[in-house]
């Protein structure tokens, strides 16, 4: 056996991968074969609060993996950016220092650029269309997953609906003209800064862990996120207005280190796959069921909610965003956009 590898379920894996599975260096050096196969722990780091659906689904996934593996395979979850910020978490999965994380498609685009196209604003007809595109068995996702594995040693295991992203600010906004000169927080990836600039604002990249402070101190005047995030993080305490721009329909993409995946036994792979199918559906359903309720809750908590009925000019936002997307990404992602639109 290579002195820099161990055996997991009968398969050789690197010491780095063993550490990604949550084993200490001494344990990784001493254990091999059947003893490791009986008990494996994989680390899952993410940036969301445990109370949010995005955070809770990681815990649900851990529970489902334990259930389907008969307790032989454990997933240890580290929420709230304990193991790093968004970019750091993406890189940690690629390097193998953790086994799992979840991220936006735009964030995963930092590992394999074409992936970011999945987060293009105003791209999907509806939620059903989005979920068909990001199903791991769809032709689009299969193509992207193959590229991601080759480029970054990372594979997608599932993607759940994350919500429609909406704008918040401390003033009423009805059209792109109302955002001229306003500094709005953007997820620190190009497709997101483009979305915010397309809405009419000046995009300020800020990591999620720093957003509440940035809003409270005036570093940025607003931000954009699904309503479940706005509610769970209590952004209504520092933002007075919610604009239902719905400019992005997002999937949260759960990824796994490829070496860690290949190091699992067939039985453990099956447990992960079954858990992925179950939690994708559960998380998607939870977010869909809560969107209207969460919007009402934000209104009840004092936010002024502005939608088309209140004069929000969705067509103007769409036209402005589409123009900028075409300028920046039309040539790069045009063929992929056509494949996405062709899925029915």
Regions from the language model: what does each represent?
Residues 2-13, 17-26, 36-131, 144-344:
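N-terminal secretory/targeting leader peptides
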Residues 32-34:
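N-terminal signal peptide c-region/cleavage motif recognized by signal peptidases
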Residues 135:
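An acidic, glycine-rich surface segment that forms the CoA-thioester-binding/catalytic face
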């Amino acid at each position: 056996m290579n002195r820099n590898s161990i055996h997991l379920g009968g398969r050789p894996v690197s010491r780095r991968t063993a550490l990604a599975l949550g084993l200490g260096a001494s344990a990784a050096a001493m254990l091999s074969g059947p003893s490791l196969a009986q008990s494996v722990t994989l680390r899952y780091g993410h940036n969301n609060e445990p109370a949010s659906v995005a955070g809770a689904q990681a815990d649900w996934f851990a529970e489902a993996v334990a259930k389907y593996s008969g307790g032989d395979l454990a997933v240890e979850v580290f929420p709230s950016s304990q193991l790093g910020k968004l970019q750091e978490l993406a890189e940690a999965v690629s390097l193998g220092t953790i086994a799992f994380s979840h991220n936006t498609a735009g964030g995963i685009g930092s590992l394999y650029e074409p992936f970011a196209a999945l987060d293009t604003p105003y791209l999907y007809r509806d939620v059903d269309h989005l979920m068909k595109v990001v199903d791991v068995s769809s032709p689009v996702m299969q193509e992207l997953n193959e590229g991601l594995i080759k480029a970054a040693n990372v594979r997608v295991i599932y993607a759940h609906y994350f919500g429609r992203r909406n704008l918040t600010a401390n003033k009423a906004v009805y059209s792109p003209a109302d955002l001229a000169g306003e500094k709005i927080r953007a997820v620190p990836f190009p497709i997101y800064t483009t979305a915010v600039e397309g809405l009419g604002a000046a995009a300020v990249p800020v990591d999620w862990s720093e957003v509440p402070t940035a809003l409270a101190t005036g570093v940025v005047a607003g931000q954009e996120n699904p309503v479940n995030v706005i509610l769970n993080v209590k952004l209504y305490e520092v933002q007075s207005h919610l604009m239902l721009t719905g400019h992005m329909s997002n999937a949260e993409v759960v990824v796994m280190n490829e070496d860690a995946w290949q190091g699992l036994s067939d039985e453990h792979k099956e447990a992960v796959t079954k858990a992925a199918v179950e939690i994708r559906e559960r998380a998607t359903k939870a977010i869909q069921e809560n969107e209207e309720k969460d919007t009402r809750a934000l209104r009840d908590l004092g936010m002024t909610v502005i939608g088309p009925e209140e004069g929000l000019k969705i067509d103007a936002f769409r036209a402005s965003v589409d123009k900028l997307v075409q300028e920046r990404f039309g040539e790069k992602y045009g063929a992929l956009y056509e494949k996405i639109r062709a899925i029915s």
